[in-house]
Amino acid sequence: METDKIVLDLNRRFAVPLPEFYERRIIFWHDEEKEYADKLDEIRLENAKLVALTGSNTFAVKKMLSVDDLTSNYVVYCPISYERQEDDWLLDIELYSESYRTDAVSNWMQELDILDNPSMRKLVKHYRKFFGAQARRAKIMAQDKIPATPAQLHMAVMAALCGIKKAQPNEILLNVLRGGLDKAQNPIYQSFVDYSAEEAFWAMVRQGCGYAEEEPDLGQLAIHLLLTASTRTLRPEFLAGLEKFLSIPHQAYCYELVSEWLHSDDLQQLYDVARYVEDEAHLPQRLEKLTVDDLATTECFPCINEIILSKLMTEISDHIIDVDVITKTVEKRRTCVWYEYFRNFYEGLLQVANMQEFFKEHSAGFHTPDAKQVWKEYAEDYYRMDTYYRLFHLSFQRSLETSNIKLDDLFKHVVDKVEGLYSYWFLGGLGKNWSDVCADEMAEHGRVLEIPQQSDFYNEYIRPADSRVLVIISDAMRYEVAASLADELRRETQSNVKLGSMQGIFPSITKFGMAALLPHKALTAELKNEVLNVLADGQSTASTNRDKVLKGVNPASVALQYKNIIGMKRAERAALVKGMDVVYIYHDTIDEASHTSDTSVFPACDRAISELKNMVRIIVNDFGGANILITADHGFLYTYSPLTEDDKVDKTSFHDMEVEYGRRYAIMQKEANPQYLLPVKFLDGKTEYTGFAPREGIRIKMNGGGLNFVHGGISLQEMTVPVIEYHYLRNGSMEYRRNKQKYDTLPVTVSLLSSSRKISNMIFSLDFYQKDAVSANREAATYLVWFTDEYGKPVSDTQKIIADKTSENGADRTFHCNFNLKSMKFSNTATYYLVIADEQGQQMQQREQFQIDIAFAIDEFDFFN
């Protein structure tokens, strides 16, 4: 600033009227940099005297101002700074005087409203390069609060260089680590170096994390931080040999920092850092010596998932399938942040546990002597094994899309064990039982008596209906898939849903099953051009003729294709069914997928469930339909593992006698008597042909692929055709009003089970319980649980509860959560709250009052002091 500008400023200030009770004005001109010490002769003031402090004339100046001259205005030029206020002999005069500064530091401090004292001024000078740019000063002004102490100013500068508004140690540390572990390549750390903030950064790290090295390194800091944090849930002795990276006194802060990162939005960066730490510390080799229980609650390292999964998979391969260990471990791990990276492996093992539990329940095997009873047991219980197998293979196939070199081969060994349990024990045992008890009736009648028949579908469900009926026929939707669909419809829609079954016609292939679902008095078969055609009362039942067959019985009928409907506008859809009493909608996702590859079938089942739910919504919303039937033409058998020669039967014994055959059925001339096949009466014996089927899961040898996914035979999986009766309940319906609580689907709720409301440790646990079992009208929900102070500020980490338990036994619906309080001071007279909130934010939060009484609680770190 030019001296004439200074003179102008000072004269202007002396011209201002004096405050009340003041007789003169004294202005202290601070110039610690002595920029104007040699220019004082140029200062000529209109109505004030100038006196300069030299360091040796302080007493004389004080005497002059206090005794000798009590009326003159003065400018006291002060080029001296004092570390301690008591060293300033003129302090009492300064306190009632005005201050004036001409240096850039003063201007910056004034601009930012930073308290002007020696310690703050010294620090602003230290960061002169930083404050020299308006854009960087603007970042300080944009922060949540004005720095009032040197520590806050250090953090404000670092926060500005990080590009964040919260000048908090956690935020700064995490942003630096997110920039990479190589100091030379980390842009944030290099900006610290450029603007002289690196020493402050390492001082903050030293006090907060306990990491102190002569040559500090970001990679070593990451190792120290994550390992120290892990000792909160992992016993320190498990990390023997890594003591130099551990600081137990700083454990709470390191855990809090890592926990905050774990629950942030940039998990991939933490994943990379955690993998780096694992490699540098050789963690997999150390931790693989521990038990699953030792590791189950530690989440910061991804390798822990690989170790846990490896141990469980190895045990399964060794024929050790501990259902409780697997289910409890998966329950603990699924709330951890890296679960999504390993979801397919965990969920696959959970299905193995379900299969093993089923095996234990039926360890005596399958020996029911009555075919009708076997059918009933399959429809009510046994089908669950098919679902577990399907869900396992869904997880397995998805795991192949995200390869993990440490787990892939082990998971494939698990597949081998699953195949043994499912294919040989379940399909083999149940298949033999069923084949044995149904053989006579199948030979004599072509069906099992006293079981509803697919060929009666139209007469049983459509003809008696007193309102419009819409039928969805999903090709190859077997019973267990329909059971999953029915469960989801109950939970997701306001409806009454019943699941029933009927025995599919033989052979269980599309052209026969689709024909059986059409109206008819008699089904016959006609051989034409070496192709067996199925006729309903003499009419073709091919897909192009089904609309005609339906209209022949009721002109107000129509046959539609799902794939056509889905692409139409709402008005176009509605026009198709306007005035119709009977609507058949054909859906083909599962069977169509089998034509691509056998392994596409189970993913197609998942898609089919979603598509069928969508079709139900379209019928309700666009068609105004309330009564919907969902069924299939047939089911299917599927096994993943390659079949052996023992799983096949040669057709040489009936060569030249076959009219048509597939891998699971054969239609032959009446006089045929093939070996190794069961006779099945064909179409009530009203044709010149007879039928045969392999026992259990045996396939007939033939050229081409498609050995693993098959249908056409008499197994329960192929012949148990589902019938879902779906009745949509409108709000005004009598049934809904009478049973509103039954039909309204609500999320299950979670409440605190522990009785104590006092916390006396930084680490503690609480028990919670799920009030209702997940059922038809109670859906699973995920809850987040944490502690806050009376102002809502979190004072603990956050735990997750996945409330999806289906057991009717309340003792099975409990959850045990471990909490860690933040490193701060707690008051035993203040009120704290446990908060239970659903993850979607759709329910009102639950709050429980707590007292926190910790004798030696750690106060918040006062960095740099």
Map each language-model feature to its residues.
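Ligand-binding pocket scaffold of soluble enzyme catalytic domains
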Residues: 475
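Beta1/beta-strand and adjacent pyrophosphate-binding region of the FAD-binding site
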Residues: 472
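…; additionally, a secondary subgroup of soluble metalloenzymes is captured
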Residues: 1-468, 478-628, 632-865
